[in-house]
UniProtKB/Swiss-Prot annotation:
Its EC number is 2.7.1.36. InterPro entries: GHMP_kinase_C_dom, GHMP_kinase_C_sf, GHMP_kinase_N_dom, GHMP_knse_ATP-bd_CS, Mev_gal_kin, Ribosomal_Su5_D2-typ_SF, Ribsml_uS5_D2-typ_fold_subgr. ATP binds at residues 12, 130, 135-141. This is Mevalonate kinase. One of its GO terms (biological process) is ergosterol biosynthetic process. The lineage of its organism: Eukaryota, Fungi, Dikarya, Ascomycota, Taphrinomycotina.
């Protein structure tokens, strides 16, 4: 068993297909270069320690206090399709005095995976840190689930670190995705599975849900080039549930009109997949994607899910690129693809304008690699661990070892 290892995985953004995907349209998600990290250290102490270093929180439990009697995992290589409700209830009792909802969710997810994948006789410390902003629709909870699941699968010998054996790597990725989905269920109840799929595999994922007229689809794609984009967090709170309900009610009132909009968004998503995976000229591809972004945003406005905070970002960024909301809308985040002609001075002025309105800005690359692993058998691990401990997360990517 490795005594110390660090795992990371990327957040995600929805490029095209928001809301329409609920009704069977194709949507396109991409990994972003903001990553979450988990350091696992095995210890001789008879306890599990979980540290959320970004918010200065630490929780610890004696191993014997965990509800091992509810663990029913017969074979880690064949995870269940849904979480063990008795185990969830037992862990919920352990966390009943945890008042902070964010901490409660993270601890429940981590403890569920720990009890399912570890041993009652092996102490561990799990330290979690993240560049992915919470509650911004960028898949922060999925990244946590993926890094915790991967760390435990590695530490207890159920998968191997990345190697030149692609078959072994693919098997490991499938197992990580399956277990991280169960971790996501602890947080979100009934997640789509897309966030943890992107956080595991990276790249792009085109997906659609099953309907009476079509089967479900999930296709992993590798773009010709990574795309540099700007994500703007408007900090405007929103209710995804209310926004989805609003589109449903609009569709009930105007079915023919809204069905046409959904079909148009489906066409945009499919066209974007072709542009990203087959377009040879990067500038030509960017301009084509820019047109799709503008069209998709207009159609989302027709569905009533935009917001004045998003409009403000659209206005501020129109001279430097193409912008649309990403995720549920109603505030939240936008994504801006810069034009090939964008000048540094224009970009700087735009960012200053957005920051003046209390937005947060993230310069990211889309379509990059998925989960990565560095272990204490790697010669550079001491430096990597030091950078992690001092939260120099931006320095770590050059060392990461990826499954894909």
């Amino acid at each position: 068993m490795s005594k110390s290892l660090i795992v990371s995985s990327p957040g995600k953004t929805i490029l095209f297909g928001e809301h329409a995907v609920v009704y069977g349209a194709t949507a396109l998600a991409a990994a972003v270069s903001l990553r979450s990290y988990c350091k696992l250290q095995t210890t001789n102490n008879n306890e599990i320690v979980i540290v959320m270093s970004d918010i200065g929180t630490e929780r610890r439990w004696n191993l014997q206090s965990l509800p091992w009697q509810h663990v029913t995992v017969e074979n880690v290589q064949h995870p269940a399709s849904s979480p063990n409700l008795d185990l969830l209830q037992g862990l919920g009792e352990l966390l009943k005095n945890e008042e902070n909802g964010l901490i409660h969710s993270a601890m429940l997810c981590t403890l569920y995976l720990f009890t399912s994948l570890s041993s009652p006789s092996q102490g561990c410390t799990l330290t979690i840190s993240s560049q992915v902003p919470l509650g911004a629709g960028l898949g922060s909870s999925a990244t946590i689930s993926v890094v915790v699941a991967t760390s435990l699968l590695l530490a207890f010998g159920n998968i191997e670190p990345p190697s030149s054996n692609s078959l072994q790597n693919n098997k490991a990725l499938a197992l990580i995705e399956a277990w991280s989905f169960l971790g996501e269920c602890c947080i979100h109840g009934t997640p789509s599975g897309i966030d943890n799929a992107v956080a595991t595999n990276g790249g792009l994922i085109a997906f659609r849900k099953a309907t009476a007229h079509q089967s479900a689809m999930k296709e992993f794609l590798k773009p010709k080039d990574t795309l540099s984009v700007m994500i703007t967090d408007t900090k405007q709170p929103k209710s995804t549930k209310k926004l989805v309900q609003g589109v449903f009610e609009l569709k009930e009132r105007l079915p023919t009109v809204i069905d046409s909009i959904i079909d148009a968004i489906d066409g945009i998503s499919k066209s974007a997949v072709l542009a990203l995976t087959s377009e040879s000229d990067k500038n030509s591809s960017a301009k084509k994607l820019g047109e799709f972004i503008v069209l998709n945003q207009k159609l989302l406005e027709c569905l009533g899910v935009s917001h004045y905070s998003i409009d403000r970002v659209l206005q501020a960024t129109k001279s430097i690129g193409w912008t649309k909301l990403t995720g549920a809308g109603g505030g939240g985040c936008t994504i801006t693809l810069l034009t090939p002609e964008c000048k540094e001075e224009e970009f700087k002025l735009c960012k200053e304008s957005l920051l003046a309105h209390k937005n947060s800005i993230y310069d990211v690359q889309l379509g990059g690699p998925g989960v990565s692993v560095v272990t204490d058998s790697d010669s550079f691990f001491p430096q990597y661990e030091s950078d992690f401990d001092f939260k120099k997360l931006n320095l770590l990517s050059k060392f990461n070892k990826y499954y894909i």
